[in-house]
């Protein structure tokens, strides 16, 4: 069969461009190791069908704990070992102190003016100071103790009302407790539209995380519309903005006393005093951070802790015995009575090791072209620290995949980012500023659920039949809701 000249030229052209796309250009630049890539999508095909944190971990085991990934048009460095985490988050902490701009941050976080996504600079430094001294200080977290105790007691009563031997949706109950605590901490009272607010936050969380088309092709604006992402986010933002505006208006009329300042009180005081350059949108973005980020991470941690304990009857028996001995039949739990219980805290630390709330942390972005340990890194390269892989590194953790709270008994490892083999809240300048609040919102709900009830799986299932499948979003949640049968 004859082939026309036009066809030959077209085929030759296609082959030429495929060759140019598939072959790496020869250059004197030192490049990080990476998997083989495809045109346009880069390395995305290696991650299709995987949980991102697990897929990236598997690639790192093959190509190295410091590797490069091309995610669509986004160039990214992936760190998957304590050694490289320490090197980059200390030596290169400032060069990688920025956050990449995202469609979600632009629309939901009021043009990236919240604490998590704000670009590195004076505004972010002031926000960080605000968190340390006002919003998330130990004193402020302590001031919300009575809220936590009251809402945890409400959950206990709800479980009892459902009846001994009747399956109870713990996923729903835990999320509700933490969401209500945080909304009361923010606004001083239960939100009239609490259910609507919670549903909006859940919508945001569903739209966040993973490798969305808008995140891997940030410059292709038409894809943001074509995928429906921009429309969905705009709809969520409009509902959220209206709700928060109403809450702020109500709060301005009946604000709390200086002694019992809510988070919103603090922000409005600073805004009105002009000692900090806050706009109305900035206030809303920060409040959303307090509520959205705190609810999802804490509720996921409590769920995973109970899930692991169900699958490990030895640990469940031990932590419940500790609680019951310490509390000695008390009707209601006070926070200070359980804060220093050794085994309860070991359970929480081990849960955070196996199930860090943000397994890929929040990505950072390089602020300038630089040389990293002999490798050339372009400006705006994304930095992904896979704490999921780091927390399970077999070089640092014996039986790394096993749930074993006792591994921390004689360990000086802390959660505060100083030990790079254990980074549940990240490390460096952009480490999560809400760790104290997050831990308080994990410890007390978990203690209440374990102290008052014995738990088993429905329908006589054995403990090892609990489904531990993950669902990836803003955080890694259980794919199926945690339905357990209480007895009391």
Curated annotation (Swiss-Prot):
The chain crosses the membrane at residues 7-23. Its cofactor is heme. CDD domains: CYP71-like. Residues 1-6 are cytoplasmic. It is found in: Endoplasmic reticulum membrane. Belongs to the cytochrome P450 family. This is Germacrene A hydroxylase.
């Amino acid at each position: 069969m004859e082939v026309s000249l036009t066809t030959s030229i077209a085929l030759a052209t296609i082959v030429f461009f495929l060759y140019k796309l598939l072959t790496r250009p020869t250059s004197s630049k030192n490049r990080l190791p990476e998997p083989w890539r495809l045109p346009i999508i880069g390395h995305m095909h290696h991650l299709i069908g995987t949980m991102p944190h697990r897929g990236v971990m598997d690639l790192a085991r093959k190509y190295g704990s410091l590797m490069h990934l091309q995610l669509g048009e986004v160039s990214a460095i992936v760190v998957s070992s304590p050694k490289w985490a320490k090197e980059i988050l200390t030596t290169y902490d400032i060069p990688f102190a920025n956050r990449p701009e995202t469609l979600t941050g632009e629309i939901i976080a009021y043009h990236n003016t919240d604490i998590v996504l704000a670009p590195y600079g004076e505004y972010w430094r002031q926000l960080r100071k605000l968190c340390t001294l006002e919003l998330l200080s130990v004193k402020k977290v302590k001031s919300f103790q009575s809220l936590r105790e009251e809402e945890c007691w409400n959950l206990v009563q709800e479980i009892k009302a459902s009846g001994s031997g009747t399956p109870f949706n713990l996923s729903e109950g835990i999320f509700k407790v933490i969401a209500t605590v945080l909304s009361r901490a923010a606004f001083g009272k239960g939100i009239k539209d609490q259910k609507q607010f919670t549903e909006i936050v859940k919508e945001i969380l569903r739209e966040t995380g993973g490798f969305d088309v808008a995140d891997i092709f940030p410059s292709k604006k038409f894809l943001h519309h074509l995928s429906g992402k921009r429309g969905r986010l705009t709809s969520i933002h409009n509902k959220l903005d209206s709700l928060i505006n109403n809450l702020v208006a109500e709060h301005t009329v009946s604000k709390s006393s200086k002694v019992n300042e809510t988070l919103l009180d603090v922000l409005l005081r600073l805004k009105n005093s002009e000692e900090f350059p806050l706009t109305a949108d900035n206030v809303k973005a920060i409040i959303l951070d307090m509520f959205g980020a705190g609810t999802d991470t804490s509720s996921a941690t409590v769920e995973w802790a109970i899930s692991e304990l169900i699958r490990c009857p030895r640990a469940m028996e031990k932590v419940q015995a500790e609680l019951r001995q310490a509390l000695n039949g008390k009707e209601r739990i006070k926070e200070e009575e359980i804060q220093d219980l050794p085994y309860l805290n070991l359970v929480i630390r081990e849960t955070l090791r196996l199930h860090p709330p943000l397994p890929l942390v929040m990505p950072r972005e390089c602020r300038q072209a630089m040389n990293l340990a002999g490798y050339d890194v372009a400006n705006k390269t994304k930095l992904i620290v896979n704490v999921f892989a780091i927390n399970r590194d077999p070089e640092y953790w014996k039986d790394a995949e096993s749930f074993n709270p006792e591994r921390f008994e004689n360990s000086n490892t802390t959660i505060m980012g100083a030990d790079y083999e254990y980074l549940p809240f990240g490390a460096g300048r952009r480490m999560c500023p809400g760790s104290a609040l997050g831990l308080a919102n994990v410890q007390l709900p978990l203690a209440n659920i374990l102290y008052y009830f014995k738990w088993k799986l429905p329908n006589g299932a054995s403990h090892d039949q609990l489904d531990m499948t993950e669902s990836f979003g803003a955080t890694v949640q259980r794919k199926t809701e945690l339905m357990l049968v209480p007895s009391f």
